[in-house]
Amino acid sequence: MEYKHILSSNQISLKTFYIENPMIAIVYGAKGEICINGQTITVTTNLTLIIPKYSQVSCDVTNFFPTKPIELHTLVLSETELQSVFSLLKPLIKSGAPITRHLPDYHLSTPEVVKTNFTLLQQCLPLEHGTPSQETLFMQQSLFFILLAVYHEGVDILNIFRFNYDEPKNQAITHLITQDPQRKWHLEDVAKTLYTTPSTLRRHLSKEGVSFCQLLLDVRMPIALNYLTFSNYSVFQISHRCGFGSNAYFCDAFKRKYGMTPSQFRTQSRQANDPNAIATMASQNDESIKKVF
């Protein structure tokens, strides 16, 4: 579990990238749009975001107040820590049950309890005389109250974090590819991993409106955007790490999708964003990149 406090004096404009670990974040002093898994969110000053693992995220926000920076607090979670907190929340969630629908809402206006707990994290971390395990316990306690407050605002956190819910096949495949994008994935390999047949899997994907080849490309491209934005790998290295058969094919597919070459995108992205904010985000994404790649 890791807490970060990020200030950006400039806009934050990022093409679609992957969040490998579950995350809760609050945004202050921003306006614009954030997109999580295809759901477009209009940002108006104070917002709490609930982001499940392997989510696709993009954003284009600017300062709401001309003289004040955009302020972002993030709490990145591990699956083990999240399950530990959910085990404590489960009895309370069952007894309260304010949820009337099971569609994922990835955002809400920041409740006072959430704001208070993130303020405590900012003020107290790192603990002056604390051990890493004590810091983790402190963050878990804050997470408990944050999730409970979000739930009582009517957000189905069980659904968002995919506890006890079946996921569409395209999402299951997305998770597989994201964990090993460099692998030369074939429909037969994926079907075997998901304990089904290629024909059945192809039929499921057809019902969900996507082909396997297109899904493969749609998953690998945001991973490439991650590398172009947050790393210094060459375009050739990125094409290899993302599983493209050749650098030429990667560059051609990238230009067809985004209307510019990978090198042009990297230059544009770095010119458009606050370098300090990008550097902080890059350090936060570094561990996730190492785990996945």
Swiss-Prot record:
Pfam families in the cross-refs: HTH_18
Keyword Zinc-finger belongs to the record: no
Domain HTH araC/xylS-type per the UniProt entry, residue ranges: 171-268
InterPro entries in UniProt: Homeodomain-like_sf, HTH_AraC, HTH_AraC-typ_CS, Tscrpt_reg_AraC-type_HTH
Keyword DNA-binding carried by entry: yes
DNA-binding region: 188-209, 235-258
A single Gene Ontology CC term: cytosol
Keywords on record: Activator, DNA-binding, Transcription, Transcription regulation, Virulence
PANTHER family: HTH-TYPE TRANSCRIPTIONAL REGULATOR GADX
Protein's recorded name: Urease operon transcriptional activator
Source species taxonomy: Bacteria, Pseudomonadati, Pseudomonadota, Gammaproteobacteria, Enterobacterales
